[in-house]
């Protein structure tokens, strides 16, 4: 069987971990007290809000607000992450995923601080947007189908278009429940890391 049709270990285990935690939280902690208190990322001046902890830069990536949020992120991770893990290697792929996720949170915190806004953050979207960026950079001319478009587009144009859309939505303030700048941040940190690795001749594209 072609290995590219199989799911490599890091992608598989990330999907399992996210899904298991999603189900466990709804069975054990249905009103999300534990998650809100300890696992999602808090950045706020509200003295009554849960405290910020540095480990939340990791744990927030494994929480999702609903099934649609979880499914969208895990489907994109599975679709694009498999190829990248085979090409980067499992250890480097995991490093890339985590760097994008942490970097996404840092960018969103920076924007929230500049605007004087309180922030709570959860979800793997920042890391997944980094995965999308990497696929577009390393396979720019691959044709992909994007719902609801009736025709395929090149991966590079999908990534550019998505980045522009996220920036526009972030600045417009539309759909304020979505961390648009975290999505952009995941892409930026991902691009920086890919360029650094290429400079070090650890990857080629």
Predicted regions and their residues:
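A detector for small-residue-rich transmembrane helices and their helix-helix packing motifs
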Residues: 1-205
